[in-house]
């Protein structure tokens, strides 16, 4: 997947950072970082959210800085 493209499979458009890979993005509008760790219903997902931890970590919601 092209990090430059950063598609959102479930809708909307992502404007991601250079290193964004946007895997499984559920955000409607992602800014700076497109968070695969954000749950679909996270209202703050589009607001400078940062994913913490490794892929496949326990609770994904706990990894997402915008969903605390």
From Swiss-Prot:
Sequence positions that bind a divalent metal cation 2: 8, 14, 16, 27
Residue ranges, annotated region (Beta): 1-30
Family: Belongs to the metallothionein superfamily. Type 1 family.
Biological process per Gene Ontology, one example term: regulation of response to food
Annotated residues for binding of a divalent metal cation 4: 34-35, 45, 49
Protein's UniProt name: Metallothionein-3
GO cellular component terms, A-Z: astrocyte end-foot; axon; cytosol; dendritic spine; extracellular space; inclusion body; microtubule; mitochondrial outer membrane
Tissue and organ expression note: Brain.
Residues annotated to bind a divalent metal cation 3: 16, 20, 25, 30
Domain of life: Eukaryota
Ranges where the record places region Alpha: 31-68
Pfam families per record: Metallothio
Residues bound to a divalent metal cation 7: 51, 64, 66-67
Keyword Zinc: yes
Gene3D superfamilies associated with the record: Metallothionein Isoform II
Residues at which a divalent metal cation 5 binds: 35, 37-38, 51
GO molecular function, one term: protein kinase activator activity
Function per UniProt: Binds heavy metals. Contains three zinc and three copper atoms per polypeptide chain and only a negligible amount of cadmium. Inhibits survival and neurite formation of cortical neurons in vitro.
Positions with a binding annotation for a divalent metal cation 6: 38, 42, 45, 67
Keywords, ordered alphabetically: Acetylation, Copper, Metal-binding, Metal-thiolate cluster, Phosphoprotein, Zinc
Organism: Mus musculus
Keyword hit for Zinc: yes
Modified residues (Phosphoserine): 33
Residues the record lists as N-acetylmethionine modifications: 1
List of residues binding a divalent metal cation 1: 6, 8, 22, 25
């Amino acid at each position: 997947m092209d990090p430059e493209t950063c598609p959102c499979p479930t809708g909307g458009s992502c404007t991601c950072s250079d290193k964004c890979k946007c895997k499984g993005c559920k955000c409607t509008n992602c800014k700076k970082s497109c968070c695969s760790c954000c749950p679909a219903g996270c209202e703050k997902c589009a607001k400078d959210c940062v994913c913490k931890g490794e892929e496949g970590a326990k609770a994904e919601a706990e990894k997402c800085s915008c969903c605390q």
